[in-house]
Design a protein with these regions (language model features):
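Short beta-strand->loop structural element characteristic of the AMP-binding/adenylate-forming
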Residues: 1, 23-26, 75, 97-103
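Conserved AMP-binding A3 loop
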Residues: 3, 10-41, 46-54
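Conserved G/P- and acidic residue-centered "switch" motifs that form tight phosphate/ATP-binding loops
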Residues: 18, 95, 152
């Protein structure tokens, strides 16, 4: 049996149906590797030492490892969805704890950020809209959030600008 990682299906996930009905999306092994590397670099190169550069995937000779638990991710994306699956793989790859919630509400998000000192959140634009419109935001300490990643749909420049006000450098 010959194996071609660039072309071989690793899994089928589902789209959100933004442009119609949800569709099965074919993800190859290389799709997963590329997405994991892309997001790991976005997160500052914090990677799991046992897998770091085992196959020469990164250009840098070394990357900083997690020093204690100073990073916590928040995700409520369905794990059967492409974006949700990739976020799970990223959390495993970077050894980052994740707060995973089955149901979203702005208050549950704010409560989790304050309680667990969430530093990063994987979200979609409709979630961001709900968060920035919520009057509850001012009742919680959200200072731990350093950055957000949005995907699966268009993110307007205006919404991006508002989100920058909620993230600390």
């Amino acid at each position: 049996v010959q194996f071609y990682p660039a072309k071989q299906e690793s899994m089928f996930c589902f789209s959100s149906g933004t442009s119609g009905l949800p569709k099965a999306v074919r993800l190859t092994h290389m799709n997963l590797i590329a997405n994991t590397i892309q997001m790991t670099v976005t997160l500052g190169g914090r990677v799991n030492k046992p897998t770091y550069d085992l196959y020469g995937w990164y250009d840098q000779p070394a990357a900083p490892l997690l020093e204690g638990i100073d990073q916590v991710h928040y995700s409520l994306l369905p794990q059967f969805h492409c974006y949700g699956m990739i976020t799970s793989i990223i959390n495993l790859h970077t050894l980052t704890p994740a707060i995973i919630e089955a149901k979203f509400s702005p208050e549950s998000f704010f409560r989790a950020v304050q309680k667990f000192r969430v530093t990063f959140a994987f979200v979609v634009p409709p979630i961001l809209i709900a968060l920035v419109r919520s009057p509850m935001a001012d009742k919680y300490d959200l200072s731990s959030i350093k950055s957000l990643a949005s995907g699966a749909a268009f993110l307007s420049k205006e919404l991006c600008t508002i989100c920058l006000l909620y993230t600390s450098p």
